[in-house]
Amino acid sequence: MSEQKEDLFKPVGEAAAEVEDESIAEQNKANDGVKLTGAQDAMGHPVQEIESLCMNCGKNGTTRLLLTSIPYFREIIIMSFDCPHCGFKNCEIQPASQIQEKGSRYVLKVECREDFNRQVIKSETATCKFVELDIEIPAKRGQLTTVEGLLSEMIDDLSQDQEMRKSIDEALYKKIDDFIQKVKSYINCEPNTIPITFILDDPAGNSWIEYKPGEPQHKWSHTQYVRTDEQNVQVGIITRDQLEQRRQEQLKQLANRERNPSESVKVGSANPQFLSDATDIENFNNEVQTFRASCPSCTQECETHMKPVNIPHFKEVIIMSTVCDHCGYKSNEVKTGGAIPDKGRRITLYCDDAADLSRDILKSETCSMVIPELHLDIQEGTLGGRFTTLEGLLRQVYEELESRIFTQTSDSMDEATKARWVEFFAKLKEAIAGKVKFTVIMEDPLAGSYIQNVYAPDPDPNMTIEDYERTKEQNEDLGLSDIKVE
């Protein structure tokens, strides 16, 4: 009789696998229909599975969800649906983060074949435009793709029914085929096709075009803007009924003010320190004035504080601060007033001493700033209006870029791009510490920006100020073209 050897101890790998399987099974029971597949991405985020309705055949299919992070963007949800009954498949992305405080507008100049390979995050509220091709892609499902991918998908959609069109309407078939060939010629960068302008506009602020450090100013730009009421409805912050209700309330308040102007300060609030309060107007320059406005994030009514500040050897500006008690939104901006000057202004400062970092600096919304030695290019509309020091402005740029663009834990950049970012941040840190010399060039078409002259009223040997004629494009962007004053 042979004895059968009994395994008293299981291998560590088998025991760990059983524990993991049991853990996944217990979590699947507790998740009420959401199952863990056991798969993970590179950062350890689990892939989840849920049974969902197929909109093609009406039976149940499987949706897989992965919450992950784009290294220099933000969190997203990648969704993949598969129906075993009819074979229907679909992939899309959804932003996992909240709707941003402001909308975003990206502009990319596609000048070579590599630019077509840039990653693009297109949320469900974003629209895309290819200006030279006269193409606009409306808001639809979210996508993680490339510039070429957007055009290729459009070509695939147009090509689907071409054979049918050829037999029904040959003229229409020929027009669509010519257009498809034209788009393909742009993708292949054939002669006389590039550059091409690609615009990505997202009122929710959750879209993005890949940026590469060290690019010239005209190549890539990102501006933020305050959403309109219609855009707030589009992104789902408020409903159409709520918008109409608020408009009716505003019309009622306006009618009450017209009927009884002396009671206008009482409409909407009991706060006596509004800008319209006659007792406070006398001390307008000495006290902080408060008025009610709509929050750009949640559209609820909130208070905005403002105070005029006179900058020596420049002009008076208005510092504005908004705080919303409903959603917690906060913003601080500087507005320059007065008449629009005939010319723009370019200020160039050579910083050769650490003391230059303590100079006051006013950067208006229309001002662009370039530091060639650091390969830093700040576009118009970026950072908004700021009244701070040169060190404070550079530190803000460093903190925002580091938190958004470069992370050590979730980095999918290629080695060349990563090396450029590391070099860029190293130079920027040295500049903030006053260890390197650099040149600041501020260009404002409205001449509303300023750098402190520490030698005032005498000229500053390290600073030059020159006025220049605005271009036709700048006048057009600022709304100064074809103005009728009569």
Swiss-Prot record:
Location of Phosphoserine modifications: 23
Kindly state a single biological-process term from the GO annotations of this entry.
'de novo' protein folding
Organism's domain of life?
Eukaryota
The annotated region (Disordered) lies at: 1-31
What's the chief localization of this chain?
A: cytoplasm
- InterPro entries in UniProt: Znf_ZPR1 (IPR004457), ZPR1 (IPR040141), ZPR1_A/B_dom (IPR042451), ZPR1_jr_dom (IPR056180), ZPR1_Znf1/2 (IPR042452)
Keywords tagged on the record = Chaperone, Cytoplasm, Metal-binding, Nucleus, Phosphoprotein, Repeat, Zinc, Zinc-finger
Give an example GO molecular function. zinc ion binding
Has UniProt tagged this entry with the keyword Cell membrane?
no
Question: Subunit details for this protein?
Answer: Interacts with elongation factor 1-alpha.
This chain's function reads: Acts as a protein folding chaperone for elongation factor 1-alpha.
The family assignment reads: Belongs to the ZPR1 family.
- Listed name of the protein: Zinc finger chaperone ZPR1
Species assigned in the record: Saccharomyces cerevisiae (strain ATCC 204508 / S288c)
Q: What is the lineage of its organism?
A: Eukaryota, Fungi, Dikarya, Ascomycota, Saccharomycotina
